[in-house]
UniProtKB/Swiss-Prot annotation:
Coiled-coil intervals, chain numbering: 222-319
Gene behind this protein: Smarce1
Keywords: Chromatin regulator, Coiled coil, DNA-binding, Isopeptide bond, Methylation, Neurogenesis, Nucleus, Phosphoprotein, Ubl conjugation
UniProt domain comment: The HMG domain is essential for CD4 silencing and CD8 activation; mutation of this domain blocks thymus development.
Main location class: nucleus
Protein name (Swiss-Prot/TrEMBL): SWI/SNF-related matrix-associated actin-dependent regulator of chromatin subfamily E member 1
Single GO MF descriptor: N-acetyltransferase activity
InterPro entries: HMG_box_dom, HMG_box_dom_sf
Modifications made to the protein after synthesis: Ubiquitinated by TRIP12, leading to its degradation by the proteasome. Ubiquitination is prevented upon interaction between TRIP12 and SMARCC1.
Length: 411
């Protein structure tokens, strides 16, 4: 009898009384009801986790896996549970848990970070332990034994189904388990065989030329359709961006062309204006300015001289008029003092004037002398006007003096 490994479950004790002649009984207990005895009535073979029906096939239990790391809140709860329980001995468990939950919510992020760090560290260790657990000989042996048991159960179910079709009895008696044969599935020989097969399988996978694809790199059909749609949308967007870039490039080239054209036109205009520039001779300009000033001075002197001459002529023309006014005043005085004498003198004057008039009309020489005086006055007026227009003076010309009648000249 081989030694049982530590991970193997303890064997089921054999029943005290066997009743092979009674169909349907597996392990008879005289103190139990017949309906609660271990019957095998053709149900699902998986309903019995430990011992199956009449074949005695057992499904082994897996070895104990590593303990999962505690969550940060559970770590904090374990740490402060005794303290809260001691301070509140009369409270119930759920009330204490409520208090601890409020304390956890009141903690700052820095205080919670300590428990989070511990949890993350233990989680990394747990993942490593799970990898070692899945690769351990005990777990591999459990997998092999479980697969064999499931295969045997399937075979038994097929046989039972065939018996039912052939009309064989529905119930069968489960045979008693032999403690000596219980360890055959977990013997050292089976463990060594499983380890040997595992090692050779790993070596063949490592040394094989085929590359094992990563599960994350496997692309499903739905994912492929989504990726195709994304590629199409990206291509459309790329074409749109390329069209926008072409438009921007065209606008830039147009602006650049206009800028260059304006620059060329400006340079040409500047060259033309530089070619048309006149050299300035300051001496010549100074001489022209002096000449213009001299001419302006001469014109000013001429205008002043002409103005003085016009004033003299106006004064000379005004003197006979003043004499006439004075004579008229004296005549009025004489008429007032001697009215009779004035009448006589008036008659004589009228007679003389008539005689003079007859003489003036009869003698052509007097007419010619009068016409010459008028012509001379007109010539003087035209000469004055010509001199005034040539000098461009702003002075107003004096009107030509009226010709003096011959009677007044004689007086």
């Amino acid at each position: 009898m081989s030694k049982r490994p530590s991970y193997a479950p303890p064997p089921t004790p054999a029943p005290a009384t066997q009743m092979p002649s009674t169909p349907g009984f597996v392990g008879y207990n005289p103190y139990s009801h017949l309906a609660y005895n271990n019957y095998r009535l053709g149900g699902n073979p998986g309903t019995n986790s430990r011992v199956t029906a009449s074949s005695g096939i057992t499904i082994p239990k897996p070895p104990k896996p590593p303990d999962k790391p505690l969550m940060p809140y559970m770590r904090y709860s374990r740490k402060v549970w005794d303290q809260v329980k001691a301070s509140n001995p009369d409270l119930k468990l759920w009330e204490i848990g409520k208090i601890i939950g409020g304390m956890w919510r009141d903690l700052t992020d820095e205080e919670k970070q300590e428990y989070l760090n511990e949890y993350e560290a233990e989680k990394i260790e747990y993942n490593e332990s799970m990898k070692a657990y899945h690769n351990s000989p005990a777990y591999l042996a459990y997998i092999n034994a479980k697969s064999r048991a499931e295969a045997a159960l399937e075979e038994e179910s097929r046989q039972r189904q065939s018996r039912m079709e052939k009309g064989e009895p529905y119930m069968s008696i489960q045979p008693a388990e032999d403690p000596d044969d219980y360890d055959d599935g977990f013997s050292m020989k089976h463990t060594a065989t499983a380890r040997f097969q595992r090692n050779h399988r790993l070596i063949s996978e490592i040394l094989s030329e085929s590359v094992v694809p990563d599960v994350r790199s496997v692309v499903t059909t739905a994912r492929m359709q989504v990726l195709k749609r994304q590629v199409q949308s990206l291509m459309v967007h790329q074409r749109k961006l390329e069209a926008e870039l072409l438009q921007i490039e065209e606008r830039h080239q147009e602006k650049k062309r206009k800028f260059l054209e304006s620059t060329d036109s400006f340079n040409n205009e500047l060259k033309r204006l530089c070619g048309l520039k006149v050299e300035v001779d300051m001496e010549k300009i100074a001489a022209e300015i002096a000449q213009a000033e001299e001419q302006a001075r001469k014109r000013q002197e001429e205008r002043e001289k002409e103005a003085a001459e016009q004033a003299e002529r106006s004064q000379s023309s005004m003197a006979p008029e003043e004499e006439q006014v004075a004579n008229k005043a004296e005549e009025k005085k004489d008429e007032e003092s001697i009215p009779m004498e004035t009448e006589e003198t008036h008659l004589e004057d009228t007679a003389e004037s008539q005689q003079n008039g007859e003489e003036g009309t009869s003698t052509p020489e007097d007419k010619e002398s009068g016409q010459e005086g008028v012509d001379s006055m007109e010539v003087e007026g035209t000469s004055d006007s010509n001199t005034g227009s040539e000098s461009n003076s702003a002075t107003v010309e004096e009107p030509p003096t009226d010709p003096v009648p011959e009677d007044e000249k004689k007086e």
